[in-house]
Amino acid sequence: MLYRVSGFYKRHTRNFTNIDYGYYIRNFIHHIASKIYPYAKVVLPNFRAAHYFYILTLVILGSILVYPVKTCAYIDVLFFTAGASTQAGLNTVNVNDLSLYQQIVLYLLATLATPIFIHGSLLFVRLYYFERHFDNIKERSLMDYRMRKSATLARLGSAPTMSSTRLNTFNNQVLGFQEREAEKGSSSSPQSSSSQTSQPVSTAYNDQGGNDIEHHSEPSDSDDDESGNGPVTFQEKIHFEEPQRPRSQRRHSRTDSGIKFSALPHPRRRKSIDPEDMYRSINMLQEHKKNQEAKSKGIQFLNIGSPVRRKSRSSNIEAFPEEDTNPSRGDEITPATNSVGTGNNDEDEDDILIIKPPIEIENSDEANPIFTKKKKLASQIQFKETPGKAKKWITTKTRKHYNPWTSKLKKTLSNSSKKGSLSVVPTDTEDDSEDEEYASIDSETSDISDNEHAADNAEGSDVDSVGSYEEDEDEDEHNSDDDDDGEGERRLGNGASLTKAQSHLVLPSKDETGGKKYTKRSNTLDTPQQNTSDGRKIRKKAPKRKTPRTQRNASFNQHSNVSIGDGSIENVDTNDSYQRLSRTMSGNYLSWTPTVGRNSTFIKLTDEQKEELGGIEYRAVKLLIKIIVVYYVGFNIIPGVMLSIWIYCMPHYKNLMISSSISPAWWAFFTSQSSFNDLGLTLTSNSMMSFNQNAFVQILCSFLIVIGNTGFPILLRFIIWVMFKTARPLSLYKESLGFLLDHPRRCFTLLFPSVPTWWLFFILVVLNGFDLVIFCILDLHDDTFKGVDMGYRVLNGLFQAFCTRTVGFSVMDLSQLHAATQVSYLIMMYISVLPIAISVRRTNVYEEQSLGVYAKENAEGVDESAPSNYVGSHLRNQLSYDLWYICLGLFIICIAEGKRLKEQDLRFSIFAVLFEIVSAYGTVGMSMGYPGVDCSLSGEFNVISKLVIIAMMIRGRHRGLPYTIDRAIMLPNAAMKRHDRLQEEHAINRHNTMERTTTLGRVATFGNGPIDGGNNLLTRAITNIEHRLRNRRDGRSESSTVSEDPRYVVRTVSEV
């Protein structure tokens, strides 16, 4: 029995504790909202209408709660509640005359009506809508985060060892193949040499007398990790060649004639599919191809087939340079023949030009004038491989296509030996002096350290040429003359023009070979094809440049990031690209690189990407709610505690409060809340004049005034930035903070991007500084401040400048100040809301839609994205719109108070009335006052004038709101999707229009032509092109010489 009761209790307790109360609460809210929504949609069509409804509800409800005490007339109660609900702060009755209950109601009204509270409450509505209408958004967002974190950790963890891992993987693929080659009994390995025979690399050296030395060593993973070189065979398509030793050194090596090392046993790789058969088939195909030597008198060139023949080739063909065995031809261009299969078989299309660098020329016994430092004149050229440790690169027939004419060889084609990376930096200007100074061309494998990796020159010339012609040749004919990058020529003294073929290093792609296709980065010299039938020069058409003009680094030393998607593996990120991505996104909150337009407009998103973006936005909103709740509650409580401690420690001010029948603790909390919420009401009858010689109260209240309104977006972004910097890397917490920093206006109305935030901070400093300077110039030595120290006078001026923003405290009698100071305060109250209003509107994601500018693009081509255009537009709209209300209110009050104005009372003048109206419309609360009363000038108005002031308060409270559409206040429903789609289309059209305008401007000014806005564009473009071509012909003379090979024309270029 007890067992059954215990089980029943546990079962019901477990069910009770597992109840999702949030689910039932959301269902209840949804049930109520579904009943009200059809009617509310008609009454409240947009956010501005809803905001009006909320403020009016607080005003009426507050008056109903305050009036029953009957300490004042209802019009005064309505005036108080309107001032508390709009943060205007004007009073017609002394606040201390109200009861404690009435003061508490005003306290709560001001707390519930601040912009922080209202816009922060929208975050709860958006959060509810996310969880209600998106199934499992929390779980799906968490899964996306774990996926991104795992991928990032795998990428970062594998980056330091990526180089050795790749090499070991490639080397293991050919284990067990070397012994098959050794069984052939013939010297079928390519002719090459190695400077270090102790490395685990298979090498073969062929000297002049035909002495063959062949080394085969067993591969070792540890050796691969240390040196970066594995067992190299021609089946791997990885070729290394050491330049010939000087003849004096080669004579000593002839004693090793006939030495041959047999192959050591190699363990067979245990695989279901041995790649041996595939490489054997490739080898059999290659054995049937021969090389043909291109010979000419003094100068011989690489034998390159036509583009049509290259397209027809079905596989990559290896190229192994053969050393020149004729000492008498050391100063000539020696063709490099490719030995495949046997040493006698030559291929007819894979001759390679091997260029000898200056370092080897200086160390060798052979003299070659063209390689003399800073010399250019020579009649014969020696091309040779660079000495140094050979590194391993991987090739494929699937590669990215790059035009060999796009990069100008302005300086030597050499590696960057500082970072151990292979880089090509395209230049945009021609500099003939650099050509003369750097007349030598280095091989890609110059003297580099063990940490540096170089590309093999033996194969890239042919393979790159094949890939480069698979582009559409008719695509960019106009680029051959318009773009400076269209000329890839390199002048070698008076010799032939040479070009550099490029390719990218990429990771394997999944294809029919099972992911065994690779490309390498090669830098080879290619000669332009010439047409010898009619003696005319024909330049190859340049394919479109596919990459931006940035320095590309391809090296095994760099940290490579591998992403897996759609069954393929790509080299998506290097260390530099990851840094560029980090600059684009503050955190790793997306698994893809977004295309973001102006004001955080995401363009061209798939459904999966939209779901992931919605998940990160949901988590960002959830985190932002926590931050704002702590911010709002904390700054409402902590300053009150601080002031309470201070006033109880200051007997003078404590006795002052007690003598006025004010509780010191209540004064502390009411004053701190009035400062932070920009209410402007005080329990003391003279506002803040009692504390004009106390620095603590003025400084603390000034800080609260700023961070409660104008400075709130600044401090909020600063808090988020500090939290982001101190957050744990790759955490869910940091991802959300990064999204808030990058795309704040997608989540919150009062959180701006970095540049508008700095702009707001600058405006805040300038406006307050201006008020302080005016005060110090005109009123610092006024008799009103007799008995006040100079330091406190400056502090009073600074405090009063802060009060002109929104709060309306008075630390001095404003009616006694200089007239110019009063006018400056009037202007500052009028524009007090503009910094926030402009920041809200110019950072609105749907700003164009809200402004209604989607009809037609600007025909005049004005850049609407410029901040000055937005600021000017908003200022014109805001100021012109506000003046109508102010003038109308002044007109009505002048009619209602006509008799008082006729009395010519200096304290009840038109300027004083205008000052009161602007203070009410700007929701500031400053007043000129009236003698004999301890309230605002509004206390002297009649009922009609008070109603006008109430209307000014309510209307002015809505000046800082966005226009009808703002994504931060929209719910993620069909309407928001429609606006997103409209914004995306507009962003694309805008980009295309700007791109066309920029293109027309560039063509119109091509060749330093006049700017005419695109008129007579075609004639001017043709004229400028002809002018440029004529300058080229006038600036240089060219001569062509036909070589013995009919496919080559040697072109000699010399400057006139």
Swiss-Prot record:
GO MF terms listed in the record are: chloride channel activity; chloride transmembrane transporter activity; high-affinity potassium ion transmembrane transporter activity; potassium ion transmembrane transporter activity
Upregulation details from the record are: Induced during biofilm formation. Expression diminishes when pH was altered, either to acidic or to basic conditions.
Note down the stretches annotated as region Disordered.
Answer: 180-276, 290-350, 404-571
Q: What ranges does the record list as Basic residues composition bias? A: 537-549
Q: Which residues lie on this side of the membrane: Cytoplasmic?
A: 1-46, 123-622, 711-754, 842-874, 966-1056
Ranges in the topological domain labelled Extracellular? 68-73, 91-99, 647-665, 683-693, 779-793, 811-817, 897-909, 929-942
Q: Do you know which Pfam families this protein is assigned to?
A: TrkH (PF02386)
Q: How is its activity regulated?
A: TRK1-mediated chloride conductance is blocked by 4,4'-diisothiocyanatostilbene-2,2'-disulfonic acid.
Name the intramembrane ranges.
74-90, 666-682, 794-810, 910-928
Decide whether keyword Secreted is in the record.
no
Q: Which residues cross the membrane?
A: 47-67, 100-122, 623-646, 694-710, 755-778, 818-841, 875-896, 943-965
Q: Which GO terms describe its biological process?
A: chloride transport; intracellular potassium ion homeostasis; potassium ion import across plasma membrane; response to toxic substance
Residue ranges under compositional bias (Polar residues)?
335-344, 521-533, 553-563
**Listed GO CC annotations:** chloride channel complex; membrane; plasma membrane
InterPro entries according to UniProt: Cat_transpt, K/Na_transp_Trk1/HKT1, Trk1_fungi, TrkH_K-transport
- Give residue spans, biased composition: Low complexity: 186-203, 412-423
- Bias (Acidic residues): 428-449, 469-487
> Which effects follow disruption of this gene?
Abolishes salivary gland-secreted histatin 5 (Hst 5) mediated killing.
What does it do?
Potassium transporter that mediates K(+) influx, as well as Cl(-) efflux as a secondary function. TRK1 is the major K(+) uptake transporter that regulates membrane potential and intracellular pH. The TRK1-mediated Cl(-) efflux should serve as a Cl(-) detoxification route and may play a role in sustaining C.albicans on mammalian epithelial surfaces, or in physiological saline solutions such as saliva. Mediates candidacidal activities of cysteine-free peptides, but not of defensins. The hallmark of salivary gland-secreted histatin-5 (Hst 5) killing of C.albicans is the rapid efflux of cellular ATP and other small nucleotides and ions from the cell as well as concurrent intracellular uptake of propidium iodide (PI). TRK1 is the channel for Hst 5-induced killing and histatin-5 may directly or indirectly alter TRK1 function, allowing the efflux of larger anions, including ATP, and the influx of small cationic dyes, such as PI.
Q: Report the family membership.
A: Belongs to the TrkH potassium transport family.
- This chain belongs to the protein called Potassium transporter TRK1
Source organism per entry reads Candida albicans (strain SC5314 / ATCC MYA-2876) (Yeast)
Q: Which gene encodes it?
A: TRK1
